[in-house]
């Protein structure tokens, strides 16, 4: 039953539909088409456009995919939440930079790894900088 229906569509209904389409003999004939004729052509042209897109899609450039979707790739993965506590009195330097990108090999201190991460992903992450206030 299903195959008979498909055969009927392909052998009878599709050719009849294509014969009724107002396809002009020349390109200039498209200018003379009326609005109702354009509306009758619309489904056919839509199917042609879809088939054309599907045919050229493998040759279109791929979108740049993000290298990794996780933020923290390797630091303290055994913990459900990574927390680093730093006592303010322990800041001996006038300025300290702490990592926010999770790529630093000296985590929690920033080593500039965010620069490579930003280039690869288009992100704009930077370090957390703590400075002593001048009195």
Curated annotation (Swiss-Prot):
The chain crosses the membrane at residues 38-60. GO terms for cellular component: endoplasmic reticulum membrane; mitochondrial outer membrane. It is a single-pass membrane protein. Belongs to the CISD protein family. CISD2 subfamily. The keyword Transmembrane applies. [2Fe-2S] cluster binds at residues 99, 101, 110, 114. It holds the Pfam family zf-CDGSH. It comes from the Eukaryota. Signal peptide: none annotated. It comes from Xenopus tropicalis (Western clawed frog). Residues 1-37 are lumenal. The lineage of its organism: Eukaryota, Metazoa, Chordata, Craniata, Vertebrata. It is found in: Endoplasmic reticulum membrane; Mitochondrion outer membrane. The gene is cisd2. This is CDGSH iron-sulfur domain-containing protein 2. Gene3D superfamilies: CDGSH iron-sulfur domain, mitoNEET-type. Its cofactor is [2Fe-2S] cluster.
């Amino acid at each position: 039953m299903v195959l008979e229906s498909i055969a009927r569509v392909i052998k009878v209904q599709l050719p009849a539909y294509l014969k009724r389409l107002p396809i002009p003999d020349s390109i200039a004939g498209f200018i003379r088409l009326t609005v109702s004729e354009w509306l009758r052509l619309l489904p056919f042209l839509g199917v042609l456009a879809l088939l054309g897109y599907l045919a050229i899609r493998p040759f279109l450039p791929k979108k740049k995919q993000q290298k990794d979707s996780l933020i923290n790739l390797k630091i303290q993965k055994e913990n459900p939440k990574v927390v680093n506590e730093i006592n303010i009195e322990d800041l001996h330097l006038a300025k300290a930079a702490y990592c926010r990108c999770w790529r630093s090999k000296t985590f929690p201190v920033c080593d500039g790894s965010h620069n490579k991460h930003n280039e690869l992903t288009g992100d704009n992450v930077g370090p957390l900088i703590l400075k002593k206030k001048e009195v």
